[in-house]
């Protein structure tokens, strides 16, 4: 058996998040069941971080021990033949036994998408529907800037987390408004349980006039707690930066000089 690293793209609408559940409705349950069938033995995966129910991912890093007689490309082909249509493996590479996608994750990007009008069956599951509410865009942008930097984000987290520290650093927070749609992007060195949805919910409350821009300062200073979590379906895990990055190393190893 050798160790492989993969990137899993999934639509989270029908799942209870990524982390394995007793009732078997999580993405990890489905992925491990499929890998176990191919390996002819029980197979577990380790991944870069859990996601809530309904959250989508463009590329979740995971690792597993797999049959050596199958190439990385063959693993990807077989997995995509067996996994349900709302999951797709977009990369598989052989990696070192020491590689751990959780310990190697140095930064992540989340994107939150919201709309004030129905977009139709192709897009509705990927946007949070927030109808008929006017929003003060300048207030949202001003509030978003306050989130950038290193802070104690405990007030932007849900109960149930056992992390040692609630300090995180956000490198970039951007907000874009176009027609009836809103996009919130966050890049940081880590995120607490429920943190992104609570930040988006607070920014929306500020835009709706239900909170003042300075409410952000109150939460970050520990004098208030965010209490509105935006719906899960608008949240996307876009990218996880890894050091070392086995996918980048694989690309470099296969580069050719055509000069």
Curated annotation (Swiss-Prot):
GO MF annotation: an example: RNA binding
Family, per entry: Belongs to the tRNA pseudouridine synthase TruA family.
Subunit description: Homodimer.
Keyword Isomerase: yes
EC number from the UniProt entry: 5.4.99.12
Keywords associated with the record: Isomerase, tRNA processing
Cited Gene3D superfamilies: Pseudouridine synthase I, catalytic domain, C-terminal subdomain, Pseudouridine synthase I, catalytic domain, N-terminal subdomain
Active-site residues, record numbering mapped to chain: 52 (nucleophile)
Superkingdom, taxonomy of origin: Bacteria
Enzymatic reactions: uridine(38/39/40) in tRNA = pseudouridine(38/39/40) in tRNA
The protein's enzyme class: isomerase
InterPro entries: PsdUridine_synth_cat_dom_sf, PsdUridine_synth_TruA, PsdUridine_synth_TruA_a/b_dom, PsdUridine_synth_TruA_C, TruA/RsuA/RluB/E/F_N
Role according to the record: Formation of pseudouridine at positions 38, 39 and 40 in the anticodon stem and loop of transfer RNAs.
SUPFAM superfamilies (alphabetical): Pseudouridine synthase
Name this protein carries in UniProt: tRNA pseudouridine synthase A
């Amino acid at each position: 058996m050798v160790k492989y690293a993969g990137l899993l793209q999934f639509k989270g609408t029908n799942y209870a998040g990524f982390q394995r559940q007793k009732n078997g409705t999580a993405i990890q349950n489905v992925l491990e069941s499929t890998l176990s069938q191919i390996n002819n033995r029980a197979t577990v995966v380790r991944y870069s971080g859990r996601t809530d129910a309904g959250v989508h991912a463009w590329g979740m890093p995971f690792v597993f021990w797999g049959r050596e007689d199958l190439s990385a490309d063959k693993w990807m082909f077989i997995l995509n033949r067996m996994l349900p249509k709302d999951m797709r493996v977009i990369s598989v590479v052989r990696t070192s036994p020491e590689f751990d996608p959780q310990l190697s994750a140095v930064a992540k990007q989340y994107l939150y998408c919201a709309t004030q009008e129905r977009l139709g069956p192709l897009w509705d599951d990927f946007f949070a529907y927030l109808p008929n509410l006017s929003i003060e865009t300048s207030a949202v942008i001003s509030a978003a800037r306050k989130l950038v930097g290193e802070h104690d984000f405990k007030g932007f987290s849900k109960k149930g987390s056992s992390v040692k520290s609630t300090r995180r650093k956000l490198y970039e927070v951007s907000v874009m408004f176009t027609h009836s749609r809103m996009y919130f992007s966050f890049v940081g060195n880590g995120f607490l349980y429920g943190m992104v949805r609570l930040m988006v919910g607070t920014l929306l409350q500020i835009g709706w006039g239900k909170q003042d821009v300075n409410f952000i300062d109150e939460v970050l200073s520990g004098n208030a707690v965010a209490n509105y979590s935006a719906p899960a379906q608008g949240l996307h895990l876009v990218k996880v930066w890894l050091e070392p990055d086995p996918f980048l190393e694989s690309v470099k190893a296969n580069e050719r000089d055509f000069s």
